[in-house]
Amino acid sequence: MQVELRDPKTIMKLSRLGSFHQSKLSFLRSFLKEFKDWEYNRNLFDLDENGYGRAVYSFSKKNRTYSLVCFANRISDNERSDRVIATKWDAAFVLHDGIPTKKDIERLELNVPKQEVGRLSYKELTLSRANKSVRAFEHVVDSLSNGRQPDKEFLSKVGYLYRTTAVYGSGKFGLADRFRIKNREEICGPFRLEMMLVYLVRQFTFDQVNHIANHKNPKNFIELDKEISRNLGIGNSTGLGMAPFIVNHPTLLNNWILAREKALKKVREVKNVQKEDFDIFVQCLKKSIKNITSWNTDSEFQKNKIKQLIADLNKLLVYIDSFNFQDDFSFNKLYLWVEENLDLECSEYIVSMMLEPYDSIINPLVHEMSSEEEKFFNIPGDRTVLDLRNILEEKYADILRIDFSKKESNENFWFISKNKEEPRLANRYNEQGSDLEQPLAIARDIKKLYERISNQKNSLRIGRFLIENNDLRHVVRRAFISEKFPYSEIQDNTIGSNLMPIDMLRLKLSFFGAVKFDPKSDKWLRICMFQGAPLPNELKKFSDYWVYNSLN
């Protein structure tokens, strides 16, 4: 039996994309698998009794070393903010190419804590900063210094000791441009360096909390239990800065979604599902429900989604009790039942679960998730208006039905903030600045393009058309990209009144491998990464299902 790939017109709706969850394809999981044979070292740990100072951690293999350089700083409580306008943080980090010299560390110490205001060099690859979860951090310090382990239930509600508020790469603020490193085999997968930075930052948080507790009361101090450490991740506060990425990188977005869709298709095509594979699926599913129950949020929107997800998963477990996995194509049968009987959130959740047993399917696809975007930048000027019209009618049918003469269809606009050069979303009718609008209203511009070519001759060459219509060059390019890359385009209006920007954030974060989505509004949220992951000195031997570990 051959299963068709799912229709992009269905999958690329934001309501569905915003229901994606971490999976075996997620970058932090594939990063750990790829780097399990690298040698981990803590090269420098020079903190004072209060935990302020410098530290260096590294991964090395053969002649290659990547080093995380950490700077822990003293700040007051009123200076601690997750907002992008913040200028001070509890700690600042940079991933350095090679082992930093004393001179490098001194140079970095002057610049890294300044973040965007500082200046870095081609030797630096990624940049980040993070703030303590003060309640969790102080609870752990107090517990360890008094000879007891911290409260697991309390920590499970937070999930981390620090949360990052930004991770920068690829040429930002002087960091190395991508062309310098893109041919390195070990980092050819998406966001490998960013994942490495966050993972090593996590280890720094454990070392720092142990160090402070030890100095506070050396007689009674005990070290943080390894099991508790494993089940703490790194938090992240993420806002609109992440959203335009998936619009601005259509071929990359396609490759992420296509890998997932290919994986699902191949799993559904497995004729004889082995008992051990079905058991892995069920075990991961049951463990994951335990994790969902520890997913805390103050957002009523997210509480309702979690409540519905748990209800749907319990329905599924009842169905599975009488399900015969020995039937031919049993995962396909299961998937079709889920699509018909459960909500979107649960459907996409189960897609992630169904991938778990199949390394042989997933591992090759991991290497298809990058993109050489410049190869597809040129517009085929010798193609015709007829070609373009056919593409628009086939690939953008739902978008062409949107009525942009209605006020609500144009309600929002995207712009770049002056002070932090970060993307923002504003109401076109209540706020100023629409003259600075960024070209992120793809649906509106596709519709405009379709109307513009309606009175053109079918035989007109695209190159000739663009001479008079240069303002639409960006969507002409996208249309021809969509011809080759079916999952490259969001099939929704990104400036309409019903836009939920958080769906765009969740999509990207699910591919990172984030869990515990905690929306603080429809424009920013907190998440957790690497919760349950092995510690760096345990990488050589660990279960690939670590993500389903739980503090509870």
Where are these regions (language model features)?
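Long, solvent-exposed non-transmembrane regions
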Residues: 2-19, 50-52, 65, 220, ...
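Charged, structured surface patches that assemble and position nucleic-acid processing machinery
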Residues: 111-180
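Amphipathic alpha-helical segments
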Residues: 16-42
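Intrinsically disordered, low-complexity regulatory segments enriched in Ser/Thr/Pro
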Residues: 63-127, 198-214, 218-246, 255-258, ...
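Residue-level detector of alpha-helical secondary structure
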Residues: 29-32, 138-141, 145, 159-162, ...
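Long C-terminal interaction/binding lobes of large macromolecular proteins
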Residues: 340-347, 381, 401, 417, ...
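Long, highly charged alpha-helical interaction/scaffolding segments
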Residues: 498-552
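Amphipathic, interaction-prone secondary-structure segments
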Residues: 32-89, 386-387, 391, 400-402, ...
